[in-house]
Curated annotation (Swiss-Prot):
This is Mitochondrial import inner membrane translocase subunit Tim22. Keywords: Disulfide bond, Membrane, Mitochondrion, Mitochondrion inner membrane, Protein transport, Translocation, Transmembrane, Transmembrane helix, Transport. The lineage of its organism: Eukaryota, Metazoa, Chordata, Craniata, Vertebrata. GO terms for cellular component: TIM22 mitochondrial import inner membrane insertion complex. The chain crosses the membrane at residues 66-86, 117-135, 162-182. It is a multi-pass membrane protein. It comes from Xenopus tropicalis.
């Protein structure tokens, strides 16, 4: 037998074990860094640099605007296809009112309406989200006033293409809609 293992009761094996434990656990072990009151008194570990970087990216105005643009495009496309599906005039030719439209014509009209709605919803979503993020960054607060201000700016910008009165109505209407939505979602 090898001479490295000592018989029980001599104490040499205990010494080796305690040296190994001291090396692995002793003063070489770092305590886990925690934030004392992170979640209402529950200690939470400190975030790594990668987590902090991802939070900064996801909280940026550009990311929020891009996310709202993509979400608006998808939602608008679905809404456009749905409204085209229930519209009785899809594929209708006013020159020949008695002709039944073909499936290809109906699908083409549904696709065109879906794409039109998708682009409009994407633009409005990106404008509103970016404006709200910029207003929130400027004010330094996250409350209902941000959505009302950004709703007014977005509605006004969309409405001013049709004139001053339309811009004022767009500002008021979009701000009121934003206030109602914010009231129910917060």
């Amino acid at each position: 037998m090898g001479g490295s293992v000592s018989p029980p009761g001599t104490g040499e094996g205990t010494l080796q074990y305690s040296l190994i434990m001291e090396h692995l656990v002793g003063d070489k072990r770092r305590p886990k860094e925690v934030i004392p009151g992170g979640l209402g008194g529950i200690p939470t570990p400190i975030k790594s640099e990668e987590q902090k970087m991802m939070e900064r990216v996801m909280e940026s105005c550009g990311f929020k605007a891009a996310l709202a643009c993509v979400g608006g495009f998808v939602l608008g496309g679905a809404f456009g296809v749905f409204t085209a599906g229930i519209d009785t005039n899809v594929g209708f030719d006013p020159k020949d009112p008695y002709r039944t439209p073909t499936a290809k014509e109906v699908l083409k009209d549904m696709g065109q309406r879906g794409m039109s709605y998708a682009k409009n919803f994407a633009i409005v979503g990106a404008m509103f989200s970016c404006t709200e993020c910029l207003v929130e960054s400027y004010r330094g607060k996250s409350d209902w006033k941000n959505s009302v201000i950004s709703g007014c700016i977005t509605g006004g910008a969309i409405g001013f293409r049709a004139g001053l009165k339309a811009g004022a109505l767009g500002c008021g209407g979009f701000a009121a809609f934003s206030a109602v939505i914010d009231y129910y979602l917060r």
